[in-house]
Amino acid sequence: RDVLGSRGLGDVYKRQGLNTSTHLADSAFEVVKRNNRHNGTWTNPCGCERQQCFAAMEDETNGLLVANRGLYEYEVLADEENAIAVTLLRSVAEMGDWGYFPTPKAQQIGTFTLEFEVVPYAAGKTGEAFTEGYAFQQDLTAAQAGLSKAWLRKPGQVKPELVSGEMPLEMSFLRFEGEGIHLTAFKKGLAKDDLFVRFVNNMPQDEVLSFRKESWMKEVYRSNVVEEKGEVLCPDENGVYHVTLREFEIATFGVVK
């Protein structure tokens, strides 16, 4: 099977051979399920669909996700082993089927740099694949390590002695976990100093969100998009909050510092 193929200069596709009639695509606060073939009323020869962060397909044994950065158009080629074709560059000389409307600037003449990622995954790892697809949207952030106190006591030393090793998880600002649950917002309140965090459950079934009560948290409560205070949450004996999120639910929490 082809690892990667191309139908021309405009797109790239991955043949998969997965035995399924549907696929998944990231949308606004949801991962939608779509049919690989359009219904009989579809007459357009192009079967392109809209995606945001990724498109994926899976059967009972395997799955494959194609993440992208800014490549929002894809098409499933059902007659080519269910390949996912991602549009890399769309260049057109004219628009419209009711006349001739030249669009010379839309020919996209030049050099372009594009980014996408192919993520194979096993059955039962759908949530982890989604997490990788969302993580691909973010650049790594570098942070300078602190200086060794021993270096401060060495007179005349010019080159700093950097501290190495792993950052301790105990000092994390917010630790959470949940199959297919992702953080979508972290902000200070508009009318008060409380912090607000928002999660979405991208799975088609209920999932449990768990997050630890950090030392800086005085109180955690359910909230909404207008930052109203709702039910106050209580952690378990280990200092962990557990909240069940319904399928595709968007949940907002307020945190009192």
Task: Report the location of each language-model feature.
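Terminal accessory/anchoring regions of large secretory-pathway or extracellular enzymes
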Residues: 1, 6, 11-257
